[in-house]
């Protein structure tokens, strides 16, 4: 949904683990920053960049894409040339920014649970939140929730565990 005469452009994205669509709006400043990164790495001025240039341009915008992620991104929009144009790049970066926003929201939620700032959600943290929300949950139910999310068997939920679980819920 590109509007050239307006202040913002929107793009819809869906992450592979999250089929829910997220609509974000780019400001003119963000669009300009993306355009500058694209132009900087479009060395030959062809209006297209290849996988290597895509990776460097994404890094310039603050992302750390893996080689496989780059291949997947390009194969999803490539017309056989192995290169993508600015509009495709803009769409990819809008999707990545949307993912970044969702990560920030999940971390914000984590901090609400992690009241003692320990870096973990403990049984006591979970019990407090359940009580604050008026959820009548038994200690056993709360312990089961922690066990379900806790991959390292520490009896508490790490940021990584919380992020993984929240991404599975399709809420973010």
UniProtKB/Swiss-Prot annotation:
Keywords assigned: Calcium, Cell cycle, Cell division, Cytoplasm, Cytoskeleton, Metal-binding, Mitosis, Repeat
Chain intervals for the UniProt region annotation (Disordered): 1-23
A single GO molecular function term of this UniProt record: calcium ion binding
Compartments (UniProt record): Cytoplasm, Cytoskeleton, Microtubule organizing center, Centrosome
Major localisation: cytoplasm
The keyword Oxidoreductase appears for this protein: no
Pfam families found in the cross-reference section: EF-hand_7
Residues involved in Ca(2+) binding: 42, 44, 46, 48, 53
Residue ranges constituting the EF-hand domain according to the UniProt record: 29-64, 65-99, 101-136, 137-172
GO biological process: cell division
One cellular component term from this protein's GO annotations in UniProt: centrosome
Matches recorded under InterPro entries: CALM/Myosin/TropC-like, EF-hand-dom_pair, EF_Hand_1_Ca_BS, EF_hand_dom
Sequence ranges of Polar residues compositional bias: 12-21
PANTHER family: EF-HAND SUPERFAMILY PROTEIN, MYOSIN LIGHT CHAIN 1, 3
Note, other: Binds two moles of calcium per mole of protein.
Family: Belongs to the centrin family.
Job description of the protein: Plays a fundamental role in microtubule-organizing center structure and function.
Subunit structure: Monomer.
Designated name of the protein: Caltractin
């Amino acid at each position: 949904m590109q509007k050239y005469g307006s202040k913002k452009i929107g793009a819809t994205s869906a992450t592979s683990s999250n089929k829910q669509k997220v609509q974000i709006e780019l400001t003119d400043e963000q669009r300009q920053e993306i355009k500058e990164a694209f132009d900087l790495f479009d060395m030959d001025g062809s209006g297209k960049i290849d996988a290597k240039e895509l990776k460097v341009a994404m890094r310039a915008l603050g992302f750390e894409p893996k080689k496989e992620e780059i291949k997947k991104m390009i194969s999803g929009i490539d017309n056989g040339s192995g290169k993508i144009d600015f509009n495709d790049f803009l769409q990819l970066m809008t999707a990545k920014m949307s993912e970044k926003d969702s990560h920030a929201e999940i971390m914000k939620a984590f901090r609400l649970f992690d009241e003692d700032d320990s870096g973990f959600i403990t049984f006591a943290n979970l019990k407090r939140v359940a009580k604050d929300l008026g959820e009548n949950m038994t200690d056993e139910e709360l312990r089961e929730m922690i066990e379900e999310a806790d991959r390292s068997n520490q009896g508490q939920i790490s940021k990584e565990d919380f992020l993984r679980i929240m991404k599975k819920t399709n809420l973010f």
